[in-house]
Amino acid sequence: MRNITNFLKTFLLWELLKGLKVTGKHFFTRKVTVQYPDEKTPISNRFRGLHALRRYENGEERCIACKLCEVVCPALAITINSTEREDGTRRTSSYEMDLFKCIFCGYCEESCPVDSIVETNILEYHFEERGENIMTKAKLLAIGDKYEAQIAADRLQDKDFR
């Protein structure tokens, strides 16, 4: 009897029919695919996208050249050179970040004592020429200046979790 049952299951392609049943069940349900360039899903305010350097309200850059972000970066993507100013404080003379090395872990953002380096919600960017993947201090400050309102709003909304 067992041999007959196994023969019928094999002959009728029982496993194939079970698979087709699952396919038929889901065939008429609502699709979950998002047509990406035309439709976009909401992005969390904790999203870790392109980096930016922030400034204080008076226009002075926040980075104090403590180099904590450079030390904590597991991918060694950040390089900082600093100079001392006349008043005895340090500031960065160059701040470079290689986005091909960066793994967007967020350690640089967490380690920064003055909230200078942040990761923005920007996820759509590309490079057309060699070397554009190296984000300089000027590029990072420009991104920070452009998106400061959004960065500040995201930080305010997320302050209880920091």
Swiss-Prot record:
Residues 54-83, 93-122 form the 4Fe-4S ferredoxin-type domain. [4Fe-4S] cluster 2 binds at C73, C102, C105, C108. This is NADH-quinone oxidoreductase subunit I. One of its GO terms (cellular component) is plasma membrane. NDH-1 is composed of 14 different subunits. Subunits NuoA, H, J, K, L, M, N constitute the membrane sector of the complex. It comes from Francisella tularensis subsp. holarctica (strain LVS). PANTHER family: NADH DEHYDROGENASE [UBIQUINONE] IRON-SULFUR PROTEIN 8, MITOCHONDRIAL, NADH DEHYDROGENASE UBIQUINONE IRON-SULFUR PROTEIN 8, MITOCHONDRIAL. GO terms for biological process: aerobic respiration. NDH-1 shuttles electrons from NADH, via FMN and iron-sulfur (Fe-S) centers, to quinones in the respiratory chain. The immediate electron acceptor for the enzyme in this species is believed to be ubiquinone. Couples the redox reaction to proton translocation (for every two electrons transferred, four hydrogen ions are translocated across the cytoplasmic membrane), and thus conserves the redox energy in a proton gradient. Its EC number is 7.1.1.-. It catalyses: a quinone + NADH + 5 H(+)(in) = a quinol + NAD(+) + 4 H(+)(out). [4Fe-4S] cluster 1 binds at C63, C66, C69, C112.
